[in-house]
Swiss-Prot record:
Catalyzes the ATP-dependent phosphorylation of N-acetyl-L-glutamate. The record marks 31, 253 as: Transition state stabilizer. This is Acetylglutamate kinase. InterPro entries: AceGlu_kinase-like_sf (IPR036393), AcgluKinase_fam (IPR004662), ArgB (IPR037528), Asp/Glu/Uridylate_kinase (IPR001048), Glu/AcGlu_kinase (IPR001057), NAGK-C (IPR041727). It comes from Sinorhizobium medicae (strain WSM419) (Ensifer medicae). GO terms for cellular component: cytoplasm. The gene is argB.
């Protein structure tokens, strides 16, 4: 490394110092998903980001998805993927595959990546320590022709109804980094598959997290010119949904951000997981890396 490169790195570290101090002993929940999960180089960059957060005194918690991997495993086993209103129908056979892929395969891959940095990660799902309880999701869809709403039966798709933070508080006082799969039991004894975004929001809300980061395949919320909006209040975000600036798949993402803030999260960021070290750029630099939504 040349002297000039060393000087640049030193300046970057000096600039990061106040942000490291700001987030020391704070909880940051990161929802890991999208393109980054399928790219080995981005996966290693993400793991090193999480490790550096821990080494800087932050309490990072990772929640992950895995929709494409679930679909691939169902195809491999000859089980047809069924969707209602764009949502996966999870029958009894499918929920077993979902749990195997999320809490088994994907979860342990992420744990291994973080452990390779020298930090200690531990793989969990909502069942561990009775951390999360769910109930059958109540979803409806409106027929565009008749304007009549009908209830969707999505099988064992769930909504979070309770989060017990005891285990997560215990891990926060340890050297462990929790990596959590969005699978949880119901009081009825069934296992439920939960949307990873809403699961992460529920975890972050229960912990009154300082930040919740959603790693996506887009830079963040864009204005009508296609430019990144750096910060929005909840009221401004709702107005952009109402006027159509926020549309399509970004609407449920932003609505989840709003719900998380209502549950006690101090700020939620939508950022591009395809950017290497996006987490560090968001947390430890002045301009961040995505769209920050605040109360």
């Amino acid at each position: 490394m040349s002297a000039s490169e060393s000087e640049i790195q030193a300046r970057l570290l000096a600039q990061a110092l106040p942000y490291m101090q700001r987030y020391e002993n704070k909880t940051i929940v990161v929802k890991y998903g999208g393109h980054a999960m399928g790219n080995a180089e981005l996966g290693r960059a993400f793991a090193s980001d999480v490790a550096l957060l821990k080494q800087s005194g932050v309490n990072p918690i990772v929640v992950h998805g895995g929709g494409p991997q679930i679909g691939a495993m169902l195809n491999k086993m000859g089980i047809e993927s069924k969707f209602e209103g764009g949502l996966r129908v999870t029958d009894e056979k499918t929920v077993e595959i979902v749990e195997m892929v999320l809490a088994g395969s994907i979860n342990k891959e992420i744990v291994a990546l973080i452990n390779q940095t020298g930090e200690w990660a531990i793989g969990l799902c909502g069942k561990d320590g009775n951390m999360v309880f769910a109930e059958k999701a109540k979803k409806t869809i409106r027929d565009p022709d008749s304007n009549i709403e009908r209830v969707l039966d999505l099988g064992f798709v769930g909504d979070v109804v309770e989060v017990d933070r005891t285990l997560l508080d215990l891990l926060a006082r340890s050297e462990m980094i929790p990596v959590i799969a969005p699978v949880a039991p119901g009081r009825d004894g069934h296992t439920y598959n939960i949307n990873a975004d809403t699961f992460a929001g529920a975890i972050a809300g229960a912990l009154n997290a300082t930040r919740l980061l959603f790693l996506t395949d887009v830079p963040g919320v864009l204005n009508k010119k296609g430019e990144l909006i750096k910060q929005l209040s909840v009221a401004e975000a709702r107005a952009l949904i109402a006027d159509g600036t926020i549309s399509g798949g970004m609407i449920p993402k932003v609505e989840t951000c709003i719900e998380a803030i209502g549950a006690g999260v101090q700020g939620v960021v939508i950022l591009n997981g395809k950017t290497a070290h996006a987490v560090l750029l968001e947390i430890f630099t002045e301009h961040g890396a995505g769209t920050l939504i605040v109360p």
